Amino acid sequence: MESILILDDDAANLQGIADVLRSEHYSVIEASTGSQAIENGKSCGPISLFVTDMDLPRSSGTDIALKLVASNPNLPVLFISGTPMAWWTNRDLSNFKRFPANRVDFIEKPFSLTQLLVRVRNLIQRTLQPRTESGFQAA
């Protein structure tokens, strides 16, 4: 069973995403702060996917993802935001280029449960493919 770490400071969003993923038989680890996500990433065994809100109170989803990927280079990341991806890439392009293109995706709020599940499945499947290039590629 794939294990998914979710980071969102909004309790309703965190619970909603967790419930949907659990209904699809994923093992879910929840975190409401960046430090909690990093600790869970270290202590909860192998993580198949990291799902994170981009805009967090004391850090960014990008910063937390980079810390997790530093210790697990094959970890795929799904970024979630109500702000368009173009804004984030213009603001933080150098950091996005540090993620392998085939192991990162972005979904903009509001999104459907189907959209979320398709992106989760695709990212987990991509981890089985060999690493080919670096850089951010929006799907």
Each predicted region: which residue ranges?
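Active-site residues of response regulator receiver
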Residues: 53, 81
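Charged docking surfaces used in two-component/phosphorelay signaling
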Residues: 15-23
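The short loop immediately C-terminal to the conserved phospho-acceptor aspartate in CheY-like receiver
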Residues: 10, 54-55
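Alpha4 helix (beta4-alpha4-beta5 surface) of REC/receiver domains from two-component response regulators
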Residues: 63, 67, 83-108, 114, ...
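Residue-level signal for the "D+5" position in two-component response regulator receiver
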Residues: 30, 56-59
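The feature encodes the CheY-like receiver
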Residues: 14, 57, 85
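Acidic, metal-coordinating helix/loop segments flanking the phosphotransfer/catalytic sites
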Residues: 30-49
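Short acidic/polar segment at the start of the alpha1 helix of CheY-like receiver
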Residues: 10-14, 113
